[in-house]
Regions:
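Nucleotidyltransferase catalytic core that binds NTPs
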Residues: 1-188
Length: 188
C-alpha cells in the first residue's frame, strides 16, 4: 500500500489543505493519505490545542483520507515516518511537502532518511524545484505537482484576519468557521 504523509500544524485547516489532500487521493498518487497534525514544538504563536485542530480536521476524514494524531507527540518528520513504518508494515510512504520546504530540506533532521521516500512536492511560486532536488542528489522517486492551481492561502493570514467574515468564508469551510466561533478560537 502506498501511504501519503501530510504533516503540519493545520492551525486552522483551510480549503488549500483540503484541496491538496483531495487532489492527491483523487489522482491516485497514493492509496491512503494520512494527515498528521503536530504539536507546537517550534514555538509558533497563537496555536490552538491539538484536540481542537484534530476536531476540525476530522470533518474531512474519508475512507482514503485519515486524520492520525497518534504520532503528534513526535517532534521530527523522520520520527513520524519511523513510527508509521512500524504501524503500517509492508507499506511504502510518500512525503507531501510544499516547494518552499524543499529549499531548506537539507536542514531537516535526518533529511537523508527522508530522501529515501517518494516525495510529492507541490509547486509554489517560482521555486525551481528541480534545482533543489539536484542539489540534494534526489534524481528519482519524486512527483512534482504542478497542475494544481496555486493555493495562495496561509493559516497565519487567516488567524490574523479572524474577525473578517469575508476572508473566513473565502478560505474556510462553514463547518470550520462554526467550530472556530463556537469555541471562540483565535480571538485576540
Amino acid at each position: 500500500m502506498r501511504i501519503g504523509v501530510f504533516v503540519g500544524s493545520f492551525n486552522p485547516v483551510h480549503k488549500g489543505h483540503i484541496k491538496i489532500a483531495n487532489y492527491i487521493v483523487d489522482n491516485n498518487l497514493v492509496d491512503k493519505l494520512l494527515i498528521i497534525p503536530t504539536q507546537n514544538y517550534w514555538g509558533k504563536t497563537n496555536i490552538i490545542s491539538l484536540q481542537d485542530r484534530v476536531n476540525m480536521l476530522k470533518k474531512y476524514e474519508t475512507s482514503r483520507i485519515i486524520i492520525d494524531s497518534d504520532f503528534s507527540d513526535l517532534k521530527y518528520t523522520y520520527q513520524i515516518i519511523d513510527a508509521l513504518s512500524k504501524k503500517y508494515k509492508n507499506s511504502e510512504f510518500s512525503l507531501i511537502i510544499g516547494a518552499d520546504n524543499i529549499v531548506n530540506f537539507d536542514k531537516w533532521v535526518h533529511y537523508e532518511d527522508l530522501l529515501k521516500l517518494e516525495l510529492i512536492i507541490l509547486k509554489r511560486n517560482d521555486i525551481d524545484i528541480n534545482y533543489y532536488l539536484k542539489k540534494l542528489g534526489k534524481n528519482e522517486g519524486y512527483i512534482i505537482v504542478s497542475d494544481l492551481d496555486e493555493i495562495d492561502i496561509s493559516s497565519t493570514m487567516i488567524r490574523n484576519n479572524i474577525e473578517d467574515e469575508s476572508i473566513l468564508k473565502q478560505y474556510l469551510d462553514d463547518e470550520v468557521i462554526d467550530y472556530i466561533k463556537e469555541k471562540k478560537l483565535y480571538r485576540k
